[in-house]
Amino acid sequence: MVEYLIVILANLLVGGMIGLTGIAGFLLPMLYSGFMGMPAAQGMALSFFAFLISGVLGAWNYHRAKNLDVRLGLLISAGSLIGASLGVWLNLLMDESLVKRILYLVVLASGISILLRKDRDRKTGGREKLPAWGMVAFGLVTGALCALSGAGGPILVMPLLVVLGVPVKTAVGVALFNSIFIAIPSCIGYSLQ
């Protein structure tokens, strides 16, 4: 009974944080597999199910507020759908301790990208324009890394979009939308293990 209460409270707290900032999902795999001792695949499946729900609700709200660039989201998500499937497959081939290290590196990379954005703003202040194939490739790589590590998506996608010059609210909306396309193959893949 206590475990169910922890899961519900953690999902509500993390879901709220994801909706506000686009970041926080990385806490769930750590909680489930680390603190609660769930098998890694079960913790990942449960985490990605929560990411799916927060992605749908968050993307819908950002779309209604006109803070979702649907074209950009679809381009990134096309790559993420394939990348996430690849990430799940790679995760199942790797040692669990290596996967945890990758999660920590993804979180670190997210923080570094935020610092880079502050520095780049001072130098240029402009928005980078990447070609469509570049956005699909971006989605492929970030989808694979997020599904592999359990990071969810927005923790890596949102700050990198901001580094590329996407306005913060739009970056959060796109990252939440994209997290749906990372969560679907990840949730299914980890559930089947």
Language-model regions, residue ranges each:
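Membrane-embedded alpha-helical transmembrane segments of multi-pass integral membrane proteins
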Residues: 54, 110-113, 182-185
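Conserved, well-structured core segments that form the ligand-binding/active-site neighborhood
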Residues: 151
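Transmembrane helix-bundle signature of multi-pass membrane transporters/permeases
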Residues: 44-52, 172-183
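Juxtamembrane transmembrane-helix boundary motif
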Residues: 1-42, 57-148, 158-170, 192-193
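Hydrophobic alpha-helical segments of membrane proteins
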Residues: 148, 180-188
